Structures are given as C-alpha cells and as structure tokens.
Amino acid sequence: MNKITTTISTNNNLEYLKLAVKSVRQNCYYKDMPLIVHAENCDDGTDEWLNDNTDKYSIEYYIDHNDKPKGIGGGMNFCVDKVKTEFVNIIHSDMWCAPNQDLELLRLYDDTDKRLIASSFRIQPRIFPNDPDYRPGTVFHTMEEFGAFCYEFDSDYFDEWATEFSKQNDIKVRKAGGAGFFCRTEDYKWIGGNDPLFAPASWEDKDLFIRMQLEGYEFEMITKSILWHFSARGSHFRDEAKDDLTKKSMRQQKSEHDNIQKWIKKWGVLPEEDEETFVKPIYGTNVNTRLEWIGE
C-alpha cells in the first residue's frame, strides 16, 4: 500500500517539468508512488506531453485552463486535494529529486504523531547577485557546476555529489522550503493550505509557515534529503523573461507589488526572519490561522 504521493504544479515550464517527473521515477525510493501533476494555463506543449507520457510515467494529471490563475500556492492546494495517501511530497516543476529524497523525509515520522513539516536541503545555482555560498538549508554552487538550465543539467554528476554530501553531513535546520515540502496530507488540509489571497505567486509560503507556527507545527530541513532547485523558473524567469537571469517577469513584478499590500492589510506588519532565515511568527493579531479547506 502506498504511503506517499508526490505532487507537482506547473505553468509553461515543460522542459523543467520533464526533469522533475524523471527524477521522481528514477531516484525516489518509492519509485512507483502516485504522482499528481497540475498543469495550469499551459500553452507550451505541457498538456500534450502529459497526455502522451501519462502511461510511461504513470502520471495522474489535471489540465486546468482558467481566467483566474491559482498559481503556485493554489496549485499545491489543488494537488493535495487529490492525494489519497497518508503523506504528500510536494515539489515544484523546477526541482530535481536526488536519490532517496522521499525516504529520508519519511523516516522523520517514525514513532511520532506531531505535526511536522519536513523539507529537503536545497542545492541551487548562484543566479542572484546576493546569493551566498550557504544560507541555512541551501547550498549554492556556481552556475557551471551542475548546469543552471534544463538543457545543460548534469543529473548523474549531481546525484553522485548529493549522495556523497548526504553521507558526510547530518544537519537539521528549523525551517521549511517554499513551494516544496513533505508532510502528512491531513496536516496540510487541517491548516487550510495556502491562502488564495496571494495567488498567483509571492508571499503565500511565508503566510502559510507563520500560520503553521502559530498552531504549533514543527519544522525540520535535513541534509539526508536533497533537492536540486533551478530556482525561480516558475516566478522570476518565466514568460517574457524565460531563462533570462537578467530580468524579472511582469507577472512576478505585479504579484510582488500587489501581495505586499495584501500582506500588510492581513498581518499589519512586514515579516521578519530568525537566525536560520526562517520567517518568524507574528503574534497578537486577529488573523485566522486556520483557513477553510477548499482544495481546488
């Protein structure tokens, strides 16, 4: 009986999606687990590719064309609503799962019933000017090391590196990964998932993690589980800014502008980060920490 379902939400990110799907079937310990893909408003061939490859990769996919995009957070909600297993492994379409990424997160739940959000350490290309060598939970490499774009990514080399890195390191950080983490399915639903207020992108992850902290959830990000994250290919570097690391998409610019105003209206103050660069809870507000679960 399956314990885990992996979910992926995507929008016009086909070449990266292909890698994400391949990594689940190639590298996850539970290679045959259910795999759910939500494809929203795609016109880049994603719909056709999913239809043509559903049997090859055993994908349960949903084609969603709408006038009000659910975006990254809403796509996560949509997928989790379809999950029938105890656990859900949420990744984004610009991620690659290293070997046993799922198993190492599942092991954190042995003999515990606490509300735990588990996340993989992330390895990313250094594509933003202020990217350091390391920030808690994320290791940065040069763009040339593994390949910063889908067409040049050296997955074999990365898998070898990630396996050795996990063997040599046993680090836990109190933190969660935006647009991708592992948890009990019911714990995601209990809190209400991502707030559709912030659709299609930006600030929804901070909002979710603050609400979770206020309700007593615990967080662990571990080096024993690894994800490669191309970084921001579904937000900054999309549409007219596709893979152009010198630009930021108009959708992302608008979302950031709009959602900071929505945030202030909802929470009253801007969020702060702790020493692990994890968003701090905001106390003393009238914000509803639990949202009504509406799924789709």
Where do the protein language model's features map onto the residues?
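Short, acidic, metal-binding catalytic loop of nucleotide-sugar glycosyltransferases
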Residues: 22-32
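A conserved acidic beta->alpha catalytic loop
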Residues: 39-48, 66
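Glycine-rich, basic loop-to-helix element that forms the pyrophosphate-binding segment
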Residues: 66-83
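Short aromatic/hydrophobic "clamp" motif used to bind/position activated sugar donors
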Residues: 88
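Conserved donor NDP-sugar-binding/catalytic core segment of glycosyltransferases
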Residues: 96, 100-149
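Donor nucleotide-sugar recognition loop
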Residues: 96, 174-180, 185, 189-228
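Active-site-adjacent helix/loop segment of glycosyltransferases
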Residues: 7, 126-127, 132, 207-296
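A recurrent flexible, glycine/aromatic-enriched loop bordering the glycosyltransferase active site
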Residues: 147-151, 158-183
